[in-house]
Amino acid sequence: MASIIYSPKDIFEQEFKTSMSGFNKKEVDEFLDNVIQDYETYISEIEELKAEIERLKNQNTHPKSPSTENRHAMVQPTRVAQSATNFDILKRISRLEKEVFGKQITE
């Protein structure tokens, strides 16, 4: 992709040297050629960006795979369930230890 040569400020501030019959025609022609090239570059960039916007819109309306999203959503509940199960096991062990060791202390 061609690079942009002039900014709007550059175009606004451009001054041409004058010759006997007015501005130097060669300098003005070169400047205008570069302006035309810039506009062609802008048009090309705009078209590429429009195409990318369309591609992203289509990608957004057609998600990759619902199973991928569900897989990530399922990870959290699985961890919570495992934590709850581990907590229940620890409570049972604690209760059993109290029963076993509590009886030994009284005997």
Swiss-Prot record:
Residues 57-80 are annotated as: Disordered. GO terms for cellular component: cytoplasm. GO terms for biological process: cell division; regulation of cell shape. It is found in: Cytoplasm. Residues 32-65 form a coiled coil. Keywords: Cell cycle, Cell division, Cell shape, Coiled coil, Cytoplasm. Residues 58-68 have a biased composition (Polar residues). Gene3D superfamilies: 6.10.250.660. InterPro entries: Cell_cycle_GpsB, DivIVA_domain, DivIVA_fam. Belongs to the GpsB family. Divisome component that associates with the complex late in its assembly, after the Z-ring is formed, and is dependent on DivIC and PBP2B for its recruitment to the divisome. Together with EzrA, is a key component of the system that regulates PBP1 localization during cell cycle progression. Its main role could be the removal of PBP1 from the cell pole after pole maturation is completed. Also contributes to the recruitment of PBP1 to the division complex. Not essential for septum formation. Forms polymers through the coiled coil domains. Interacts with PBP1, MreC and EzrA. This is Cell cycle protein GpsB. It comes from Streptococcus uberis (strain ATCC BAA-854 / 0140J). The gene is gpsB.
